[in-house]
Amino acid sequence: KWAKYESSEIIPLWVADMDFRSPVEVTREAQEICKAGNFGYGICPQTLTDTIVRRMSEMYSWPVNQGWITWLPGMVCGLNVSCRAIADQGTQVITNTPVYPPFLSSPSNSGLTCTQVPMVLEDGRFTIDFDYLQSLHTKSGDLFMLCHPHNPVGTNFTLNELTQLSEFVLERGLYVCSDEIHCDLILEDSLKHIPFASLSDEIADRTITLMAPSKTFNLAGFGCSFAVISNPELRRRFKRAMSGIVPDPPAMGFRLAEVAY
């Protein structure tokens, strides 16, 4: 971001390229990898998968099976793959606004319509307009794209809000792509991140959860993200949408993700 605006008076403040250094353990490991000089293709080490499964259990009380994890080179890629996996003739994508721009471009990239649901400001906090949601015409199989915690308004949705959204999802027969890349950056001790898919087996069955270490540890340039999809058929559709287009993360991405976590 500083390269883009180095000669102007603009101060770039977006979050993907933070101005904090990555943890010393990560930079040290990157230096060791560079010294070894091997930058070939990578395969996810079992130790990283085990670390993520343990992390989900310990931090979020969310029992994740290692077979549910699918690796991606980035979160924007995951948003687009989710749209392609769900895409059918007439499929509608619903999302809250304002929102990270790829939430709005991903549907059109797959030939889908995007319905924007403006968030409402209540007591100094942005939240979902559930009355507006209920007024929408939807069909079974439509996709709700959730940004949780929300970028850019910063809302960490409460259990009550997520439960209300889950009831709407099940009532309408929707699928959900939940981008939870900021889940580790909850800065208030009184708040706790709740993965949307952890609410119930019924919700997990209809949810694609996207996560990555990139925002938390300033690793966006190493391209290592993952999707958690418990439904075998939904996971098959997701992987089919990736086929021949989406590469695995690089070896260094896998290794630095493990060190960071």
Question: For each of these PLM feature ranges, what is it?
Answer:
Residues 85-107:
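Conserved PLP-anchoring active-site segment centered on the Schiff-base-forming lysine
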Residues 110, 171-172, 203:
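Helix C-cap/helix->beta junction micro-motif
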Residues 115, 120-191:
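Active-site phosphate-binding strand-loop segment of PLP-dependent enzymes
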Residues 1-74, 81, 260-261:
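N-terminal small-domain helix-loop-helix segment of the aminotransferase-like
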